[in-house]
Amino acid sequence: MSYTARAAKHPSPVAQRLLRLMDTKKTNLCASVDVKTTAEFLSLIDKLGPYICLVKTHIDIIDDFSFDGTIKPLLELAKKHNFMIFEDRKFADIGNTVKSQYSGGVYKIAQWSDITNAHGITGAGIVNGLKEAAQETTSEPRGLLMLAELSSKGSLAYGEYTEKTVEIAKSDKEFVVGFIAQRDMGGRDEGFDWLIMTPGVGLDDKGDALGQQYRTVNEVISTGTDIIIVGRGLFGKGRDPEVEGKRYRDAGWKAYQKRLQ
C-alpha cells in the first residue's frame, strides 16, 4: 500500500502528516545528524533538508546547545525544507520520570520534536507518561516509536523482549506510531499500521569499530522498513551531504517503488 493510501486510514495525526510528506517529497530518508556544535548541526541539516522526510537528533550531544540558538533555527529549517523532527531520546524510566524528562529540563523535547522514542523495559507506563507530557506541553500532535530491535552487534532487543515491546505498543494506537526495528512488526490483522524506521543502513560501509552493523537499502525496504535512517553515510569521511542525500533518497525511493509492484 502506498504511503498516501496508508495516511488516509491512519489513526495518528503525526503518522498521517509524515506519510503524506514522504509521498509529496518522494523520500523515505531520515538523516541522523550527530555532531557537537550548533553551527555544524544547522549547516548539515540545511544541506540535507531537500532530500529528507525526517531529521533524527541527539540534542544532548551538542556542546553549545541553547533553545533559542539551536531549536528555533531547527524549526525554521523544518518549515523551509518540509521535514519533520525525531529526537532519538530513547526514554527508559518509569512513567512519572519520563514525563518530566520529555517536557522539562534544558531540552524541553515535547515542545519541538514531532516524534521521540522509548524502550519497553519499564512497561506500558512509559507510553502513558510520555503521552501525558505531550498533551500538557503542546497542542501540536506528537508521536512515539518503541525500540523493538537495534542494529548494534550483541543487542539484547530480540525474541521475547521484542514481542513484549510490540504488546506495549498496542496500548495506544494514536500516540505510538511505530517502531525502531529491522523488519516489519505485523499488527495489520489487529488494525495497526506501524511505521518501521531502521537505523544501520549503508550503501558503502558494512560496519564500524564499535559494533554498528550496516544493511543495504534494498534489504531493509524489502523486509518491511518504511524509513531508512542514515547518519555517517551522508556526511562522514569527507562525504558531500548534498550528493549523498540525493543518492540515499533516490535509492530509498526506488526500493519503495519496487516493493509496491
Swiss-Prot record:
PROSITE patterns: OMPDECASE. The keyword DNA repair does not apply. The active site is at K90. Its EC number is 4.1.1.23. Transmembrane segments: none annotated. Pathway: Pyrimidine metabolism; UMP biosynthesis via de novo pathway; UMP from orotate: step 2/2. Substrate binds at residues 34, 56-58, 88-97, 214, 232. One of its GO terms (cellular component) is cytosol. It catalyses: orotidine 5'-phosphate + H(+) = UMP + CO2. Keywords: Decarboxylase, Lyase, Pyrimidine biosynthesis. Belongs to the OMP decarboxylase family. PANTHER family: OROTIDINE 5'-PHOSPHATE DECARBOXYLASE (PTHR32119:SF2). This is Orotidine 5'-phosphate decarboxylase. It comes from Kodamaea ohmeri. The gene is URA3.
